[in-house]
């Protein structure tokens, strides 16, 4: 099982998951897939609300997570940073960077502030989401749950740096 993510400790109790993949589309199209509600619904879930820096959105993801997120930075078409569950003990930062590589685009997503014990579940989840993003670009449906179930053991066996 190939994993495209890594996990690392930030401190004794919190950590980060980082996943990246290369997509057969240009940076503008991938940016739209990562920021437009109708495109997000095809691969990660429903998002609605104030879609501007400082705005709060409500999300309901295919992974089962549901809650608010604040848009902290939005620099089209290269960088997006959100704080999920802002102001709570479950607060995390989700950051995405897009980089063109020829006619393709690399997407790197990092979520920071996760409980260390939950890193494997989030690593498998983010990989399944990024694979669903690739599927959505060619009109295929999400396979999130099946892929998460296939990936979780590999992430549980992976080292946390």
Predicted regions and their residues:
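Terminal "cap-and-tail" regions of soluble proteins that handle hydrophobic small molecules
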Residues: 1-11, 102-106, 111-161
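Hydrophobic ligand-binding cavity/cleft-lining segments
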Residues: 1-47
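Alpha-helix N-cap/helix-start and coil->helix boundary motif
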Residues: 24, 37, 50-51, 65, ...
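Residues at secondary-structure transition points
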Residues: 25, 89, 117-120
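Hydrophobic-ligand binding "helix-grip"
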Residues: 41, 45-53, 58-115
